Every structure is written in C-alpha cells, then in structure tokens.
Amino acid sequence: MANQLILLKKDFFTDEQQAVTVADRYPQDVFAEHTHEFCELVMVWRGNGLHVLNERPYRITRGDLFYIRAEDKHSYTSVNDLVLQNIIYCPERLKLNVNWQAMIPGFQGAQWHPHWRLGSMGMNQARQVINQLEHESNGRDPLANEMAELLFGQLVMTLKRHRYATDDLPATSRETLLDKLITALANSLESSFALDAFCQQEQCSERVLRQQFRAQTGMTINQYLRQVRICHAQYLLQHSPLMISEISMQCGFEDSNYFSVVFTRETGMTPSQWRHLSNQSD
C-alpha cells in the first residue's frame, strides 16, 4: 500500500548497533494503522483500547501481550487510559547466542501466535526486567547495548515462562482473581457468564471484584465481555461464511436481532454492512 505509515529504525534507535530499546506509551493515544522496520513486544499495563492487528480486532486490557513482526499492520482506537510499553528490537542486530525462535513467536519465520496473556506474577517480573532494560537502552557507556540485549534475553524467557493462551490459565496457577476472571470471560464467548457463581466458586466478594476490575481496566465486567464478543463477531463476519444468526450464537447472543442492535451501537454499522465493507477491502 503506497500510503502505508511505516515506523523507521532511525526514529527509535540511537545508532545502527543498538538492537533493542523501550518505547513508553503513558498513555497510548489513538494511532493510525502502520507497519515497522523493526519488531516489537507490546505489554499492556492498564486501561483498555481496541487493537486491530492485521485487520483482526482485539479488545485489550491489563495483562495482554502481543508479539508483533515488522510486516504486521496494526492500529489503536477507542482508547481509554490505555497504558502500555513497546519493547522494540531488530532481529538482525541481536548478537547473543540465544535460541530466539524458541522464545519469540514469529521470530524470523518461527510459528506465530501473536496474542497471549500474563498474570499478575508474570507482569510484575516482566516489569522489573523492562525497567532495567529501559535504563540500559538509554545508557551511553560502552557496555549499554550488550547489557540491554542480555536483559532482552531475560525478558523473552520470562514472558515464555509466564504467558498463557487467553482462554487457558493453567490449573496450577497462583494468579489473582482478576486474572482468573479475565480467563473465565474469554471462555464465555458462546455462553452466558454468571459472576455470582464465579464469586461463589472463588469465595470472593462480587462488589469488591467489580471495583477491582473497573479500576484496572477502565470498564465494567459486562462492558468488557460485550466488547470481546463484538470483536470476535467482527472477525467471523470478515473471515467466515457463517450466517449472521450463526455468528450471533457463537458470540453469546441467543437473539440475532439483539445482536444486531448491540453490534450497530458498538461499531456504527450493522453486521451486514460490516461484512460487506470488510469484503470490499480484502
């Protein structure tokens, strides 16, 4: 695409030897679709927003982790106090003898699964390493680049150790109620979610959990679940031949008319209009 925005190495790296650096987004504003001359890891700390990656929408919030390749197209819209960090790196500049392909999904042709989650424990450990990495990447002493790359290696290993699929928090996990709740919501795309039953199972206060969720994500629990379902519906409308009534069922809406009302309110167009517009742009 001739008018595609491309983020350039020279605007982010201090010199041609620097392999990795950190770009803070406190907060992340709306950002038009773009690609890069480099790769990046995206770590979401707080708030929420709509992250569209290669035309697939994701409603993101605390704990979301993305592995972005240079050629990937992505953008940020509908942001609400969204705080994240981009750890950006140039694969060809990495010198450390590490099996990067085993650590980073999509690294130089490795199998790519872009979207993961981190629980609170993983986030805390990653944040400590990122803070050190940011300090070294801004350093000017002769060993700063080498130290930054060592810390990057530690970071990608930490992320691999703690990441999990969005709907599959390990049964042995010691993560917080908030992490368990977000995983439970991801497992409720096609069925109703009963918060009272969840709280009874976890022996926690429903009122306190609602407050914690809103404080960390900027949304209510129902708003988040609705947004996740609508994102899934957008993807199915564009990439599957399913009828709208079938998509409605797969996204937790038993009434297709109600689904259309909610979809239109959230996106500004009907499901049919979305599908038509998406097919035109393909």
UniProtKB/Swiss-Prot annotation:
The record marks E246 as: Interaction with sigma-70. Signal peptide: none annotated. Residues 196-217, 244-267 bind DNA. Residues 179-277 form the HTH araC/xylS-type domain. It comes from the Bacteria. GO terms for cellular component: cytoplasm. Its main location: cytoplasm. Keywords: Activator, Cytoplasm, DNA-binding, Repeat, Rhamnose metabolism, Transcription, Transcription regulation. Transmembrane segments: none annotated. Pfam families: AraC_binding (PF02311), HTH_18 (PF12833). One of its GO terms (molecular function) is sequence-specific DNA binding. SMART domains: HTH_ARAC. One of its GO terms (biological process) is rhamnose metabolic process. It is found in: Cytoplasm. The keyword Transcription applies. Binds DNA as a dimer. HAMAP family: HTH_type_RhaR. Activates expression of the rhaSR operon in response to L-rhamnose. This is HTH-type transcriptional activator RhaR. It comes from Salmonella dublin (strain CT_02021853). The gene is rhaR.
